[in-house]
């Protein structure tokens, strides 16, 4: 394909190589994976893992918007991005939040989700999927329903409810 609406890069494994094509290090893998960001349309978005410095560096290559995601709190990359009024999916106060600038809309309580066990998605993978959905224009209510459908949800009484 020539261009795309949403391009996603979830990480660069520094050990990943493709020696038969002379890709023998992280910087060379960066050059390969950056093409996914290079082809994002001006009205599209790149979804990037803010916790991976090489992936975060790709933001400047995008013709469209950038939606960062990060499992940690206080990421300088995310904080600077939000300070410009842009979007990020992050964990804040035990919640998964869709943040735009200083505003945030919670879409899930982490304490109510089974994450990273028994075949459930890992948190970083879940955040990437949420960020991709949001980049495609899907609203918070539908994203919330998707999370509850994908993950096992604990009720208020801590009983496991399979959604």
List the predicted regions and their residue ranges.
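Beta-strand->loop->alpha-helix junctions that form or flank phosphate-binding loops
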Residues: 64-91, 120, 146-148, 158-160
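Gly/charged, well-structured mid-domain segments that form the phosphate/adenylate-handling core
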Residues: 118, 133-163
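Acidic-glycine-rich active-site phosphate/pyrophosphate-binding loop
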Residues: 86-110, 156-160
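Short, conserved micro-motifs enriched in small and acidic residues
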Residues: 116-127
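Flexible active-site lid/hinge loop adjacent to a nucleotide/diphosphate
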Residues: 1-77, 110, 116
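Fold-independent oxyanion-binding glycine-rich loops
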Residues: 10-12, 49-51, 58, 69-72, ...
